Regions:
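Bacterial N-terminal signal peptides that target proteins for export
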Residues: 1-8
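Lipid interaction determinants
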Residues: 21-85, 93-152
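Short beta-strand-centered aromatic/proline hotspots
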Residues: 88
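C-terminal motif of bacterial Sec signal peptides marking the signal peptidase cleavage site
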Residues: 16-19
Length: 152
C-alpha cells in the first residue's frame, strides 16, 4: 500500500511539474500606451499614410512623462526652425488616444487632431487621426541632434 501511495505521489508531482502551459512563443510585442512608454525623443519618419519627409526636412517631438509636456522641433513649411511646446494627455477608453495643446504664450491652441496610438514598441509608434484614418504618421525613437538643441 505504501508503494502505491508513493507511486501516486510521484505521478502527481511529475504531472504538476510537466503539465504547465507552454510559454507563449509569439508574445505581444506592443507596449501599453502610457506617458512612461512614450517619454523621450521621437522623429517623424512618414506622414499622410506613407509620405516620406523631403530631403533636409525634420520633425522631432520630445515627451516629458512627469510634466505631461512636449517640445517639438521642425522645419516643415518654412525655411527656419519652429519650436513649439505644450501639454499632452492620453486616454485609454478602448483605444489609446493622445491629444494635446500648444502654449503659444498668447493662449492655448488644441492640436489639429486627436490620434489613436497604435503599434507602440520601444522603437516606433503609429499615430492615426481619430477624425481621418487616412492621416497616418509613423514615429521612430531617436536622439535630438545637437544642432537642433543649439538653435532653440
Amino acid at each position: 500500500m505504501k508503494r502505491v501511495v508513493k507511486f501516486l505521489m510521484v505521478v502527481v508531482a511529475f504531472a504538476a511539474a510537466f503539465s504547465c502551459a507552454e510559454p507563449d512563443l509569439h508574445p505581444n510585442p506592443y507596449l501599453d500606451v502610457t506617458a512612461n512608454n512614450i517619454k523621450g525623443v521621437w522623429r517623424m519618419q512618414s506622414y499622410d499614410n506613407g509620405v516620406q519627409l523631403a530631403e533636409g526636412s525634420y520633425y522631432y517631438i520630445v515627451f516629458d512623462r512627469a510634466e505631461r509636456s512636449f517640445v517639438s522641433y521642425d522645419n516643415l513649411g518654412s525655411m527656419g526652425q519652429h519650436t513649439k511646446s505644450g501639454k499632452f494627455d492620453i486616454v485609454t477608453d478602448g483605444a489609446a488616444v493622445i491629444f494635446g495643446d500648444y502654449d503659444f504664450g498668447l493662449g492655448v491652441n488644441d492640436w489639429e487632431h486627436r490620434y489613436y496610438v497604435r503599434n507602440l514598441t520601444k522603437d516606433s509608434m503609429v499615430w492615426v487621426a481619430v477624425d481621418d484614418e487616412e492621416l497616418v504618421t509613423v514615429y521612430v525613437r531617436d536622439e535630438l541632434p545637437e544642432w537642433i538643441e543649439k538653435r532653440q
